[in-house]
Amino acid sequence: MGSSKKHRGEKEAAGTTAAAGTGGTTEQPPRHREHKKHKHRSSGGGSSGGERRKRSRERGAERGSGRRGAEAEARSGAHGRERSQAEPSERRVKREKRDEGYEAAASSKASSGDASSLSIEETNKLRAKLGLKPLEVNAVKKEAGTKEEPVAADVINPMALRQREELREKLAAAKEKRLLNQKLGKIKTLGEDDPWLDDTAAWIERSRQLQKEKDLAEKRAKLLEEMDQEFGVSTLVEEEFEQRRQDLYSARDLQGLTVEHAIDSFREGETVVLTLKDKGVLQEGEDVLVNVNMVDKERADKNVELRKKKPDYLPYAEDESVDDLAQQKPRSILAKYDEELEGERPHSFRLEQGGMADGLRERELEEIRTKLRLQAQSLNTVGPRLASEYLSPEEMVTFKKTKRRVKKIRKKEKEVIMRADDLLPLGEDQTQDGDFGSRLRGRGRRRVPEVEEEALEDEEKDPVAQPPPSDDTRVENMDISDEEDGGALPSGPPELEEDEAELELQKQLEKGRRLRQLQQLQQLRDSGEKVLEIVKKLESRQRGWEEEEDPERKGTIVFNATSEFCRTLGEIPTYGLAGNREEQEELMDFERDEERSANGGSESDGEENIGWSTVNLDEEKQHQDFSASSTTILDEEPIVNRGLAAALLLCQNKGLLETTVQKVARVKAPNKSLPSAVYCIEDKMAIDDKYSRREEYRGFTQDFKEKDGYKPDVKIEYVDETGRKLTPKEAFRQLSHRFHGKGSGKMKTERRMKKLDEEALLKKMSSSDTPLGTVALLQEKQKAQKTPYIVLSGSGKSMNANTITK
């Protein structure tokens, strides 16, 4: 009971000796007292030590076991206390890893008299030498002590832990030093020289060796390259790398993408990361690149500008008209409203080939817009500049020296008349001597009678005239060079006549009129007599002009506003016997105005005759007979399928309708031609009604056999004030209201209008939507929520009901 430290040390020595005698490798450390009430707990350990000593004495019969037990006892007696104090934690780990089942089996064998025993470590070593799988050590942890049998905790020695850490640090430093010495041992120092540097033969030998190695490496590389080419390995490798290179996303894939920033916002040498701009789920459009930081900066700048609230009226403010790229800025009036009316102007540009963009295209477009804006007339005057003695190339292009026009006046030696033969196409022999146009610039022209007689004889010999050339006056306007008519020009200075330009115009007009008259002559070439009459008419007209007209007015035609207005009206044909159809000849001949006004009711075939023409009074009767012979015998009947008015007009022309309007017009008509027309219609009516009025009071005596298969399909439809077709019920209601003079009430009218609106909505409904447009509303909701779906939560009853809570 009152044991001291000496007695406790002897017990521990005895315990360790017994454990060594059993041949076990594990050592049981001494249990230190944890509390005063557990200081006599070691008596149990002494009893267990006695059992171990008994077993050791039984095994001590053998020599080897006895020797091992003595050595273990001596070792434990010498160093037992020191080990227990230095390494308590290590012994605890070994004690926890001990297999209690194996120890029990070993103790049972020892008690049965088997003297040989091996530990698990030794058994595993033997099994490893034999190539067998080592045994597994089942570490069975002892249960923690209970309240009745507590287990003493191990004492932690901080000095031992510190010494262990210092030893580990020393070992690590030694290992690092050893590795460093091994690495530096291969490097030569400055004091050590190679032997081949001082010896020439050694240097030559080394150089030859290096050259041989180099040649051998080149041969090997060449051989490998030939083998690759022979088997196609290099081609396959190149194709593989090329395919990988093409599959990689590179700068060429950026061509055509839009960057939604101004190009001047990117500074040179600055790296900017662009990402795809977010857009709606249902939004379809091209991808746009933006930078998040730049977007935030632009938004912040805009907010700053809005916060400033600058005054709008700045009459003397001068904004910078040039931007950073030395380009002219567009200036607009009331620019503060541009963004509100036109929306925010986007600043963007497109990437070109290779993902590059220099902004050249945007600047060109801006220059074009500026030029278009500056095309308007400006009040800015040109600034002063130094006068130059020479013209610039641009001014030389615009400079054109006016050429003085000298009038060529012929001598009035011989005047010839225009003949039909002059209009014949020239032959090869007549090309040089032919007349290319009028060379005579005189006023009055005297016609030679001999020339006229020759013209008449030629016309009689060849009544069929050749087709004249076109009425293009460009041939007559040609000017022949001075070499051809050098003798015709006067030697002195040319005498310019008054109003020469006007006279020249009149001559050209007269020439065109003659060409048109000869064209009429070609149309009447089938009759020689008619050609002769036209020639005589021309002759008489020319003679009459020579006798009656003034010499100043010869060969001219007088134009005034009235004649031009009447000529441009053209022919306005009017149908009917009392119409005012034009004669075959033109109404614009001033010589026959009075005669035409007297005989305006004569008929004509309405043949188109454009231009100026003159006819003698003696021949007027012949032309009237000619025109009367070409009139149509039957009048034109109006087309019935054009409408009810055309059908009534047809009945009126045939005399089937008896109208009082025509009878009144017959009595009160101021024109003489109207009664004759009415009389003809009345006469026709009498002839047509000769048999119809006789059967008027008789009735039908027989059926219409030709109408046996006729079954009329009558469909009566009524429409309202908006043009909508009414149903039979609605039509009856409308007629009833109109007859009785009353209408529907307010409620009925509103219900009817609501029903009509619903029908109109149903007709206007899209084929892919409901009448109320719920599909469009669904798409708008998805666009607002930025999701491709919509969540329907709860029912209509629960959503509409009012929830009452306490």
UniProtKB/Swiss-Prot annotation:
Residues 58-101 have a biased composition (Basic and acidic residues). Disulfide bonds: none annotated. There is a cross-link at residues 125, 133, 141, 147, 188, 277, 329, 336, 400, 414, 554, 654, 663, 690, 705, 715, 729, 755, 764, 781, 786, 797 (Glycyl lysine isopeptide (Lys-Gly) (interchain with G-Cter in SUMO2)). GO terms for biological process: maturation of 5S rRNA; mRNA cis splicing, via spliceosome; mRNA splicing, via spliceosome; positive regulation of cytotoxic T cell differentiation. GO terms for cellular component: Cajal body; catalytic step 2 spliceosome; Golgi apparatus; nuclear speck; nucleoplasm; nucleus; U2-type precatalytic spliceosome; U4/U6 x U5 tri-snRNP complex. Residues 451-461 have a biased composition (Acidic residues). There is a cross-link at residue 141 (Glycyl lysine isopeptide (Lys-Gly) (interchain with G-Cter in SUMO1)). Belongs to the SNU66/SART1 family. Plays a role in mRNA splicing as a component of the U4/U6-U5 tri-snRNP, one of the building blocks of the spliceosome. May also bind to DNA. This is U4/U6.U5 tri-snRNP-associated protein 1. The lineage of its organism: Eukaryota, Metazoa, Chordata, Craniata, Vertebrata. The gene is Sart1.
